[in-house]
Amino acid sequence: MADNYLEKRYEEVFGAGAAGHSKKRGGPSLNTLLVRNRSTRRFRTDAEVSIEHLRTIVEVNTRIASAMNRQTLRFGIVRKEDDPAAYGRLRDLYVHGQDWRIPPSSFIVVFSTLPEGRFIDIDLGISLQSMSLKAVELGYNCLMIGRNTAEELAEAYSAGDPARAASIAGLHPLVFLAVGKADQSAFLKPVSLADAPLDESGHPAPGFLAYYDKDGVHYVPKLVLEDILL
């Protein structure tokens, strides 16, 4: 066989320069992921998130920054299919009496090995945003839920199972993350403080930056750069 036969044949089929130079496709830019990363309150009921994808989402925490590199955060994955009891209790916390909320089929519960404090909260914010961006990259959306007490969250995750309760003994529940396929459209709406209605004290009126739904679209007002840059 002639020298370089395979390389020459590859070039004939795929074009000159193709051999030895596989073309890499770039993924979505950070700006694209940020725009797609919208809080979702209505999820598709027919879409499940695989355990592999959930592990991939949690895995970003092995690469992100951590205050003093303490790496105190721990994560519990709960899927409707695998953990129906815990899922049911977390679903109830998610809906919170608001029937228009449609829960996803999976949650990620975040715990800490240390009591909540300033640096734990900084780590938590980095973690939640990073996991949400990874979820978006995989085709999902998220919602961060932090209104519940630590006791409520621990109770929901344990779901009356002594083994599950033992697995989180000594940990401090923080928040949980809903992960699924969005069943709503979201749109960022640039707004300026110069256009804001003012209250009696001269400050922007309450509700100026509140998100809202209109004609099936979820609108999220965001201040323009000129308003946040000092």
Language model: regions and residue ranges:
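Acidic, surface-exposed loops and disordered segments
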Residues: 1-230
